Swiss-Prot record:
Domain notes: The Walker A ATP-binding motif also binds Pi and PPi.
Catalytic activity from the UniProt record: [HPr protein]-L-serine + ATP = [HPr protein]-O-phospho-L-serine + ADP + H(+); [HPr protein]-O-phospho-L-serine + phosphate + H(+) = [HPr protein]-L-serine + diphosphate
Organism: Clostridium acetobutylicum (strain ATCC 824 / DSM 792 / JCM 1419 / IAM 19013 / LMG 5710 / NBRC 13948 / NRRL B-527 / VKM B-1787 / 2291 / W)
Xref: SUPFAM superfamilies: HprK N-terminal domain-like, PEP carboxykinase-like
Encoding gene, per UniProt annotation: hprK
Identification of the protein by name: HPr kinase/phosphorylase
Enzyme nomenclature, EC number: 2.7.11.-, 2.7.4.-
Subunit structure as annotated in this protein's UniProt entry: Homohexamer.
Function: Catalyzes the ATP- as well as the pyrophosphate-dependent phosphorylation of a specific serine residue in HPr, a phosphocarrier protein of the phosphoenolpyruvate-dependent sugar phosphotransferase system (PTS). HprK/P also catalyzes the pyrophosphate-producing, inorganic phosphate-dependent dephosphorylation (phosphorolysis) of seryl-phosphorylated HPr (P-Ser-HPr).
Length: 304
């Protein structure tokens, strides 16, 4: 994944002071503040990163005699950089402006404070450069947890999601879930075209926020638990104690997985709701229901 300089300019509302080379792409979300480089130190210089000049670097350059400033800036421009951004609406020094034109480098300006701009551009690049995949399923926010419901086509994922929405939970995505890995966290969202829509077989597509209100949908959600729905298979040894530790890898990130068998008479939505509540409980509790039962058995045995 790569992001063009033109995309950054458009999405971050940057002013172009000097237009650089066409076709420059960014593959890193990190930034570099070139204060050390202006001081003459070039070891470990991240020249492949976006260069951000804040008030500190700008003031340092301003304090230099003109001949020293030109020498330092010219040495800095010997290294290829994707773009230079002046934060806080700062006015570029003449030497910086002249070298940007001479070396055909992008020189941009942001009105935002330096720290805020850095956070903004890093979040933007993290999102755009994050590894991504699309999974067939339904993503629902239940008790603040992102529950990804998967399973065979026609198993009842969307119908289950509809029941969960009626119970006050929120839909993130139906049918197709776009998932990105950002700093080892999986974030799921709906493709733009199907955002807020839910397909129910025999009924068609329904507009969830139109029927249930804007609070019934969410734009994106971290994925905490995967629940796989399958038809009940006789003879299969399903987990009855909650001790199975099954995981699935999405974008090489392990996620807790539960397999939920479906058969007539089971209220799947209620079971998933309980599974989410139990998962949240287990995150904070050191004592599982199995431990409690074992303790009671031990107490009963000692009493006898």
């Amino acid at each position: 994944m790569q992001v063009s300089i033109e995309d950054i300019i458009e999405n971050l509302d940057l002013e172009v002071l000097v237009k650089g080379k066409d076709g420059i792409k960014l593959g890193l979300s990190d930034i570099n503040r070139p204060g050390l480089q202006f001081a003459g130190f070039y070891d470990y210089f991240g020249n492949e990163r976006v260069q951000v000049i804040g008030k500190a670097e700008w003031s340092f350059l301003n304090a230099m005699p003109p001949e020293i400033r030109e020498k330092r800036i010219r040495k800095y421009f010997q290294f290829e950089t994707p773009c230079i951004v002046l934060a806080r609406g700062l006015k570029p020094q003449k030497e910086l402006l002249d070298c940007s034109k001479e070396y055909n480098r992008w020189l941009l300006r942001s009105k935002a404070q330096t720290t805020r701009f850095i956070n903004k551009i890093m979040n933007y690049l993290d999102d755009k450069l994050a590894p991504e995949t699309r999974i067939h399923g339904v993503l629902v926010d239940i008790y603040g947890l992102g529950i990804l419901i998967t399973g065979e086509s026609g198993i009842g994922k969307s119908e289950t999601a509809l029941e969960l929405i009626k119970r006050g939970h929120r839909l993130v995505a139906d049918d197709a879930v776009d998932i990105k890995e950002i700093e080892s966290v999986l974030v799921g969202k709906s493709p733009y075209i199907t955002s807020g829509m839910l397909e129910v077989r025999g009924m068609g597509i329904i507009d969830v926020p139109a029927l249930y209100g804007l609070s019934s949908v969410l734009s994106e959600k971290n994925i905490n638990l995967v629940i796989y729905l399958e038809q009940w298979k006789e003879g299969r040894d399903y987990d009855r104690l909650g001790t199975d530790d099954e995981h699935i890898k999405i974008l090489n990130i392990p996620v807790r997985k539960m397999t939920l068998p479906i058969r007539p008479g089971r209220n799947v939505a209620v079971i998933i709701e309980a599974a989410a509540a139990n998962y949240r409980y287990n995150l904070s509790s050191k004592i599982s229901p199995v431990d409690t039962i074992n303790k009671r058995i031990e107490e009963s045995t000692n009493y006898d």
